[in-house]
Design a protein with these regions (language model features):
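N-terminal, positively charged/glycine-rich alpha-helical extensions of SAM-dependent methyltransferases
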Residues: 1-32
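Conserved alpha-helix/loop element of class I SAM-dependent methyltransferases that forms part
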Residues: 42-60
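Class I SAM-dependent methyltransferase SAM/SAH-binding core
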Residues: 64-120
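A short SAM/SAH-binding and catalytic strip from SAM-dependent methyltransferases
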Residues: 130-142
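A short glycine-rich, Lys/Arg-flanked "PGG" loop and its adjoining helix->strand segment in the class I
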Residues: 144-156
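Conserved class I S-adenosyl-L-methionine
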Residues: 161-181
Length: 181
């Protein structure tokens, strides 16, 4: 696997385990500022992008969010049977509190929460109408395996929507290094 330094911070295949452990620790440390940093890194477009992704869900659908983080997207999606998946127990703890509070205020049932990586989703085949992956695909350990798992849990005719700012240039690479410092 090419190193992130050799590709300007971008690795199309994923990240290795050592890099992942460092990233997970940094992400957990960023929880108090996660939304603010995401807004800055996307020049304020993150809310618009999340809204556009939400429009792909229809009432009554079974929806899985892979890499839910602290629940920034999941708290605003309504009328669906929602499952939030993230490898970080700390992110899931924050997401559960945040998302279930929002769902409760709308009279909706709590979401389900699963601690797992995208490359090993412990959910049944052909379960979800939509799978959303916002701002986390770039951090998959193995993108190909993650996509295989997502496609496995999607129902036939279901849709995967990925929304990610990426790290494909020096600016995003620099921004990511500043954020994670």
């Amino acid at each position: 696997m090419a190193s992130r330094n050799a590709t300007g911070g971008y690795d199309p295949s994923g990240i290795d385990l050592d890099e992942w452990e460092i990233l997970e620790s940094q992400l957990e440390e960023s929880i108090p500022n996660y939304d603010r940093v995401n807004r800055l890194m996307t020049f304020g477009q993150d809310k618009v992008w999340r809204k556009n992704v939400r429009e792909h869900a229809e009432p009554g659908m079974k929806v899985l969010e892979v890499g839910c983080g602290p629940g920034s997207f999941a708290e605003d999606i309504t009328g669906v049977d929602l499952t939030c998946l993230d490898p970080s127990p700390e992110m899931l703890k924050v997401a559960k509190r945040r998302v279930d509070s929002a769902r409760n205020s709308r009279g909706e049932s709590p979401a389900d929460y699963v601690q797992a990586i995208a490359e090993a989703i412990p959910l049944p085949d052909n379960t979800y109408d939509r799978v959303f992956c916002l701002f986390s695909f770039r951090d998959f350990q193995d993108k190909e395996k993650g996509l295989e798992e997502i496609l496995r849990v999607l129902k036939p005719g279901g849709q995967l929507v990925i929304c990610d700012a990426g790290k494909a240039n020096w600016f995003h690479g620099l921004g990511g290094r500043i954020w994670m410092a």
